[in-house]
Amino acid sequence: MRREISFLLQPRCLLLLVALTIFLVFALFNTGKDEEKQVIEDHEITNRVFLDVDIDGQRLGRIVIGLYGTVVPKTVENFRALCTGEKGKTSSGKPLHYKGTPFHRIISGFVIQGGDIIHGDGKSSDSIYGGTFPDENFKIQHSHAGMVAMANTGPDSNGSQFFITTVKASWLEGEHVVLGKVIQGMDNVFAIEGGAGTYSGKPRKKVVIADSGEIPKDKWDEER
């Protein structure tokens, strides 16, 4: 009579199976981490801008943002120019500048949002192109805290409003154009969230961009 040997009953085979399982789990885990790292790091930073922030009239500190100008050049140019104020005024006479504007929406565990250069309450927006402009692309993901993206009222309605994530926000993919990431001052972003954030989004304190501008490349340090 032919004797059959079950694979699962052999000690050596059991050890082999366990080792193979551990190897596959480890490989899949590392692949996921590598892909996440690639999403975060593969985009070239073409410009650096800063936001100096006050809370209730007291200086909090600086947030430095690296911009992805090779991926979303039109969106980046709008944001960069609004940081410097170099484009003058809107058709209604308001400065095309983030300086002096508030973070009007601060949601605990989600985002800090600002950039309403018209009324400062989140109900209006404008751009250096005159009015709103289309979504450029959605190639960059909201992959971790510190991603900077355009706020909008629906498809192709980008203006001056933007937000900075305080968590990974993958549910926003395909709806908001990511244009950069915080490279210095993330502690200040969390301080804004913790000090003024609410679950409704209405700030508990007055948070204002006291100054903003661009950092020349010859002033960049080695940190990305």
UniProtKB/Swiss-Prot annotation:
Subcellular location: Endoplasmic reticulum
Stored InterPro entries: Cyclophilin-like_dom_sf, Cyclophilin-type_PPIase_CS, Cyclophilin-type_PPIase_dom
Any single Pfam family the record assigns to this protein: Pro_isomerase
Glycosylated residues in this chain: N158
PPIase cyclophilin-type domain span: 50-214
Subcellular location, principal: endoplasmic reticulum
GO cellular component, one term: Golgi medial cisterna
Superkingdom of origin: Eukaryota
Tissue: Ubiquitous.
Alphabetical keyword list: Chaperone, Endoplasmic reticulum, Glycoprotein, Isomerase, Rotamase, Signal
Job of this protein: PPIases accelerate the folding of proteins. It catalyzes the cis-trans isomerization of proline imidic peptide bonds in oligopeptides.
The protein, known as: Peptidyl-prolyl cis-trans isomerase CYP21-1
Organism, scientific name: Arabidopsis thaliana
Gene field: CYP21-1
